[in-house]
From Swiss-Prot:
PANTHER family recorded: FLOTILLIN-LIKE PROTEIN 3, FLOTILLIN-RELATED
Lineage: Eukaryota, Viridiplantae, Streptophyta, Embryophyta, Tracheophyta
Organism the protein comes from: Arabidopsis thaliana
Protein name, as recorded: Flotillin-like protein 3
Known function: May act as a scaffolding protein within caveolar membranes, functionally participating in formation of caveolae or caveolae-like vesicles.
CDD domains: SPFH_flotillin (cd03399)
Lipidation (S-palmitoyl cysteine): 36
Subcellular location(s) per record: Cell membrane; Membrane, Caveola
Length: 479
């Protein structure tokens, strides 16, 4: 027995006793009856040069580099790799040929369905298609493509397609360069002519604009001269208007001052009269206040005394009412306390009664369970025992006797004796029953007659003692 530990890029594949299939672990105990294999899961680069042929039957070589390794993030894929590939070294010819066969097969099938132009121009899409198809095949071995790099396509010896394609591109580039040079020369000569024409045009344009500007300057000078003369005239008129306005304002101020002086004289006279009236009014008000204070002093003292008296009486009455209310409140509180105490006592009594009923019910339940067990759970026997023990039958008999005491009922008892005869013989049983029926009929009719007074039909016969009773009833009726 040994304890095995795998490195960071390794796993332990353990088989043997106690393991159903394969146990994958990084570290584990390995017993003598178990086998342990260490396999590496680090990816490996595989370089290939795949010879393929396009749909136009043009052969070429596809250099490719694939980085392939076990899928460590999928336990099922890792188990597949351990079962199928772990016994071979990842650099062995077996693994190399397996991967190369899958890549070459899928690449050739894909290239055979594409043209050379599609392969050459769609390198990115071509790489994705190869990646997906190869990965689909590698899934069954638990392998995954970490990276796939398709290099530049190469010609097969004897088939220089890419060489001719490069020469074609070079010739097209050279021809395009010549065309570009010719166009540049043409643009240069045309540009020189255009510059010369533009120079002449611009010179003529500048001369014309100079003449226009000189004429404009002369007109502007004349306009400025007229404008200055007009402004001088306007200034003179404004000054004359200002002088006239100042004269008018002076006359207005003189008239206003004269008016103000006359108004001031009138206001002074009126102010003296108003002051006299105000002083006279104050004198009269002071006289009225003096008389008012005198009257107030006379009547207010009397009213104050009456007010104090009324206030004292009201306070005394309020005090008496408060005391009465407090007494009534105290009495109500005592009554409420007494009522509460009585209610508590009644509640306690009811509570004790209820507890007694519960205890009695428990005792009766135990009693009934004991009785029921004694009669082997026979409810009818227990019911009969309880009715006999409690005197129910005696009470029923007394009640019935009291009920029919004053009714004076008629009770008929009869027996035809057919039971004993019915027990004898087998062949005569039917005849005995019929005979018993006939024997029973007369007593029944007699009983009906005694109880109800009704006679049987005439075809049956006449009852004994019926005629005397009828005659007796008739005599009573006549009497």
């Amino acid at each position: 027995m040994s304890y095995r530990v795998a490195k960071a890029s390794q796993y332990l594949a353990i088989t043997g006793g106690g393991i159903t299939d394969i146990k994958l672990a990084k570290k584990s105990w390995v017993f003598p009856w178990q086998s342990c294999t260490v396999f590496d899961v680090s990816p490996v680069n595989y370089t290939f040069e795949v010879q393929a042929m396009s749909s136009e039957k043009l052969p070429f070589v596809i250099p490719a580099v694939f980085t392939i390794g076990p899928r460590v993030d999928d336990p099922h894929a890792l188990l597949l790799y351990a079962m199928l590939m772990s016994q071979h070294d990842k650099h062995s010819n077996h693994v190399n040929e397996l991967v190369q066969g899958v890549i070459e097969g899928e690449t050739r099938v894909l290239v055979a369905s594409m043209t050379m132009e599609e392969v050459f121009k769609g390198t990115k899409e071509f790489k994705k298609e190869v990646f997906d198809k190869v990965q689909l095949e590698l899934n069954q071995f638990g392998l995954v493509i970490y990276n796939a790099n398709v290099k530049q396509l190469v010609d097969v010896p004897g088939h220089e397609y890419f060489s001719y394609l490069g020469q074609k591109t070079q010739m097209e580039a050279a021809n395009q360069a010549k065309i570009d040079v010719a166009e540049a020369k043409m643009k240069g000569e045309v540009g020189a002519k255009e510059r010369t024409g533009l120079t002449i045009q611009n010179a003529a344009k500048i001369d014309a604009e100079s003449k226009i500007i000189s004429t404009q300057r002369l007109g502007e000078g004349t306009k400025e001269e007229i404008k200055v003369k007009t402004e001088v005239k306007v200034f003179q008129n404004e000054k004359e208007a200002l002088v006239a306005k100042a004269d008018a304002a002076l006359a207005i101020q003189k008239a206003a001052l004269s008016q103000n002086s006359r108004v001031a004289e009138v206001e002074a006279a009126k102010a003296v009269a108003l002051r006299e009236a105000e002083l006279q009014t104050k004198v009269e008000k002071m006289n009225a206040l003096t008389r008012t204070e005198k009257l107030k002093a006379e009547f207010l003292s009397k009213a104050s005394v009456e007010y104090e008296t009324k206030v004292q009486e009201a306070n005394w009455e309020l005090y008496n009412k408060q005391k009465q209310a407090e007494a009534v409140l105290y009495e109500k509180q005592k009554q409420a306390e007494a009522t509460k105490a009585a209610a508590d006592a009644a509640f306690y009594s009811k509570q004790k009664d209820a507890e007694g009923l519960v205890a009695m019910a428990d005792a009766q339940g135990t009693y009934l369970k004991t009785l029921l067990g004694a009669v082997n759970n026979d409810y009818s026997a227990m019911r009969d025992f309880l009715m006999i023990n409690n005197g129910i039958y005696q009470d029923i008999a007394k009640t019935n006797a009291v009920a029919i005491r004053d009714l004076q009922p008629k009770i008929s008892v009869w027996n035809h004796g057919g039971a004993e005869q019915g027990m004898n013989g087998g062949g005569k049983a039917t005849m005995n029953d019929i005979a018993g029926l006939y024997k029973m009929l007369p007593p029944v009719l007699d009983t009906v007659y005694e109880q109800t007074g009704m006679q049987p039909p005439a075809w049956i016969g006449t009852l004994r003692g019926a005629e005397p009773k009828q005659s007796l009833h008739a005599q009573q009726h006549r009497g």
